[in-house]
């Protein structure tokens, strides 16, 4: 399976779900082909944004410039309806995990598709994990993810600020607190409490 990185306003999603009076709503994102994976599910939606088909992603079915409606695996479900689904499923010979149960029910229950238009990264392998981190060096993507309407606050460590020696050379990089930097860093993300000596050179890396 894949994970998604995004900052979604759940209150807005719940409002749309309630206004449309559906038992289930699912968030999707139109993704470029190069960011898709065979583990992703693709949604087809009709003119009312109702999910009409769910299928596994197959790269051979899409052109390079296509935008593909990828399911994010984020759902809003009425509580009573969810309980009834799970009560029925528990008596099956091989009960499905919840994420598969919900995915399989999208068409049957005429689920509403909710398009997410903000920053999102589909993380399904080491490269996509690396790319998601490198995206944070882009100010627009960084702001969209961490400083949207609902801001993200990381855990406070109350450490001293990172120290940059006179010998340090820094280009397009981000640093957490508590580090000592004496060498050269470019296009990289450096975590807390890292020590880079004078002769060290870090490039295009996550440390």
Please give the residue ranges for each predicted region:
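Unchanged
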Residues: 1-133
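Left-handed beta-helix
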Residues: 80, 89-207
């Amino acid at each position: 399976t894949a994970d998604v990185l995004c900052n979604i306003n759940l209150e807005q999603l719940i409002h749309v779900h309630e206004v449309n009076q559906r038992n289930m709503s699912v968030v999707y994102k139109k993704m470029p082909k190069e960011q898709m994976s065979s583990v992703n599910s693709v949604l087809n939606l009709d003119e009312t944004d109702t999910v009409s088909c769910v299928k596994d992603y197959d790269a051979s079915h899409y052109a390079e410039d296509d935008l593909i409606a990828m399911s994010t695996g984020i759902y809003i479900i009425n509580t009573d309806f969810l309980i009834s689904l799970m009560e029925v499923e528990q008596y099956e010979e091989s009960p499905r995990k919840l994420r598969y149960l919900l995915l399989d029910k999208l068409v049957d229950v005429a689920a509403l598709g909710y398009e997410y238009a903000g920053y999102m990264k589909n993380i399904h392998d080491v490269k996509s994990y690396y790319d998601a981190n490198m995206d944070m060096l882009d100010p627009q993507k960084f702001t969209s993810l961490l400083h949207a309407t609902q801001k993200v606050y990381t855990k406070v460590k109350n450490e001293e600020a990172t120290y940059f020696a006179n010998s340090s050379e820094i280009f397009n990089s981000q640093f957490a607190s508590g580090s000592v930097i004496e060498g050269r860093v470019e296009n990289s993300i450096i975590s807390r409490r890292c020590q880079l000596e004078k002769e060290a050179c870090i490039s295009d890396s996550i440390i």
